[in-house]
Amino acid sequence: MSEMMGNNAVWGLIVQSDFMTKMVMLTLFFMSVICWAIALYKLILLRIKQKQCREVLHEMRKCTTLQEVLQVASENKKTLPGYVLVQLLSHGKNAQETNSIELFQFQADSIIDDVLYQEEAYTPVLTISASVATLLGLFGTVWGLIHAFVRISEKQSADIVAVAPGISEALITTIAGLVVAIPALVFAQYIALKIRSLEHSLVSLSDKVTVMVRMSMTKQSPAVQHKSDESI
């Protein structure tokens, strides 16, 4: 019962606040909705993709040839690790033709960088929202205090009736700013940690393919040299 009365009191303070305070609260509310939507969306996707990477890496442990890797890639072509494998194998074929493992490693790094860049999409919104929400809360605090001093000047009195509305506006906007900023900052850091974990899995995938491409090129080199000697 007391909790319901407290909620009604807070809502009453928001309703009775001035236009500027309502605008700050409305902005913070929309920022909170956007941050939670982005955070849940990114966390769900990252969890799915990390699980896919673990499964593909487990299958890759059984592979000993590029042909077996190609089979794994074709079976998982609709997943993120499957897409990365297809791209790596495509560049691996070119590396075998040009006999340039350095070029393949550069291309593999570029593929992973592009994937990670896409995975980081929308996450800056969380860090920006955390900073902006804090500043909006501070702005609301200052605005509420100014409002309180204006009422003191108008009423020529510093009693609680005069200053309470301004002080309540200041405290409400401060709390609202923190309620938006803290989860946004926590989500941003946690998502960054998940992206680093995904990066580790993709690098492991790339390293496995790189080793196989290098081994394939090593096997091809003696054969090419033998054909060259025969032609001479």
Regions found by a protein language model. Name each.
Residues 1-7, 180, 209, 213-214:
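Feature detects long, helix-prone N-terminal segments enriched in hydrophobes
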Residues 1-10, 98-106:
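Short, membrane-interfacial amphipathic segments enriched in basic
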Residues 2-58:
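Hydrophobic membrane-targeting segments
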Residues 18, 36, 69, 85, ...:
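Residue-level signature of catalytic and energy-coupling elements of molecular machines
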Residues 23-40, 129, 133-139, 176-180:
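Lipid-exposed faces of alpha-helical membrane segments in multi-pass integral membrane proteins
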Residues 51-159, 186-232:
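Predominantly long cytosolic amphipathic alpha-helical stalk/bundle segments
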Residues 156-170:
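Hydrophobic alpha-helical transmembrane segments and adjacent short intramembrane/lumenal linkers
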Residues 168-186:
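Hydrophobic alpha-helical transmembrane segments of polytopic membrane proteins
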